[in-house]
Swiss-Prot record:
Co-factor requirement: FAD
Keyword Transit peptide attributed: yes
Organism encoding this protein: Caenorhabditis briggsae
GO biological process, one term: medium-chain fatty acid catabolic process
Protein name: Probable medium-chain specific acyl-CoA dehydrogenase 1, mitochondrial
Length: 417
């Protein structure tokens, strides 16, 4: 409660201080009963289905269709699709809880299940009712895949460097170009595609690109070989080439020329989910490390009794809990329709770094066994690295964070956003 002096100095009435006190009592970090049930159901599926199958799919690299179908039947796939389009209609926070739980079992299998999320976001942001009913409705009805096609061989972090172009002819657009590292590309029923619609290289990004929904069976689309990646190996990643691909004008997402804003806006919705994936991996690292430390003996006692190991476990726990807080906050920002670029970037950046440090510590705690594929932490370390790369590298997140805080400080005299 504010003191009488503080109340007077700030110009707050007694009624206002009462409201402030009431609001402070309403702040809670507890999940609702429904959210706890969602989390428990996802974690049960993760431990019973994903954990036992993780190593097999990591070795084979096969896409986990049967597991994807099971997840869809349980409502764990694309849970953020609104009920009006046939989906579960879960919040961004509830979706993050599912991603975290599934990633505890295997981030590669999780990506197979939740990979369409990034393609869903721009449709949700900029799609008209007909587009949402058709494309979101299809994802809700069946366990199918959709892909986000923006990255190119020469345009990763620099989205303004996209070379894929589109040309309007009558009631159609003709798309030509090549996209790289497309998650789910080998199985996608439709693609979100960003193409340059203004041939002037000096045109501002906000007016130079147009976004499309492109059906996967459109003539002129070719799918490259499945990439052999360091981690998350069952995730299907490919190059997608568009050669004179004709797309009806009705498949433009948002206004012509406004594609860059649509593509970037999707990240505010999806980065909390990516952060949640990193959380799940870090959580698994901590559990595996604690279990091993209580069993493995060295110098006549369990290694958990050695301070060097205790400190690594403590560091993992500290960062995991902090990453979880900012991830949940960034997800809640989306649900509350608060502009979330700042917190979403912090969550994605910190959770990604947390996952990588947790994996490094886990391997260290396991010692020589941690370097061997017979133990789970070797795979966790390989899977962790991509979180510092995809959906915006950790360096790009830091650029976003610094620009926003400096701009806010210049305008408001404080870095607190």
């Amino acid at each position: 409660m504010l003191s009488r002096f503080a109340t007077t100095s700030l110009g707050l009435s007694r009624s206002a201080t009462g409201v402030l006190a009431s609001q402070s009592r309403q702040i809670s970090f507890d999940l609702s009963d429904t959210q706890k049930e969602i989390q428990a159901a996802a974690l049960k599926f993760s431990k019973e289905v994903l954990v036992p199958n993780a190593a097999k799919f990591d070795e084979s690299g096969e896409f986990p269709w049967e597991i994807v179908r099971q997840a869809h039947s349980l409502g764990l796939m694309n849970p953020q699709i609104p009920e009006k389009y046939g989906g579960p209609g879960m919040t961004t926070l509830e979706t993050a809880l599912i991603v975290e739980a599934l990633s505890y079992g295997c981030t590669g299998l999780q990506l197979g299940i939740m990979g369409p999320s990034l393609a869903i976001a721009p449709v949700y942001i900029a799609g008209n009712e007909e587009q949402k009913k058709k494309y979101l409705g299809a994802l809700a009805a069946e366990p199918i895949i959709a892909s986000y096609c923006v990255t190119e061989p020469g345009a990763g972090s620099d989205v303004n460097g996209v070379k894929t172009k589109c040309e309007k002819k009558g009631d159609e657009y003709i798309i030509n170009g090549s996209k790289a590292w497309i998650t789910g590309g080998g199985h996608a029923k439709w693609f979100f595609v960003l193409a340059r619609s203004d041939s002037d290289p000096k045109a501002p990004a906000g007016k130079a690109f147009t976004a499309f929904i492109v059906d996967g069976d459109t003539p002129g689309i070719s799918r490259g070989k499945k990439e052999k990646n360091m981690g998350q190996r069952c995730s299907d990643t490919r190059t997608i080439t568009f050669e004179d691909v004709r797309v009806p004008a009705e498949n433009v997402l948002g206004a012509p020329g406004a594609g860059f804003k649509v593509a970037m806006g999707a990240f505010d919705m999806t980065r909390p989910g990516v952060a949640a994936g990193a959380l799940g991996l870090a959580w698994r690292c901590l559990d595996e490390s604690a279990k091993y430390a209580l069993q493995r003996k060295a110098f006549g006692t369990e290694i958990a009794n050695h301070q060097a190991v205790q400190f690594m476990l403590a560091d993992m726990a500290v960062n995991l809990e902090l990453a979880r807080l900012i991830t949940y906050k960034s997800a809640t920002d989306v649900d509350n329709k608060v502009r979330s670029s700042y917190n979403a970037s912090i969550a994605k950046c910190f959770a990604a770094d947390t996952a990588n440090q947790a994996a490094t510590n886990a391997v260290q705690i396991f010692g020589g066994n941690g370097f061997n594929s017979e133990y789970p932490v070797e795979k966790l370390m390989r899977d962790a690295k991509i979180y510092q790369i995809y959906e915006g590298t950790s360096q790009i997140q830091r650029i976003v964070i610094s620009r926003m805080l400096l701009g806010h400080f210049a305008q408001n005299g404080t870095s607190r956003i």
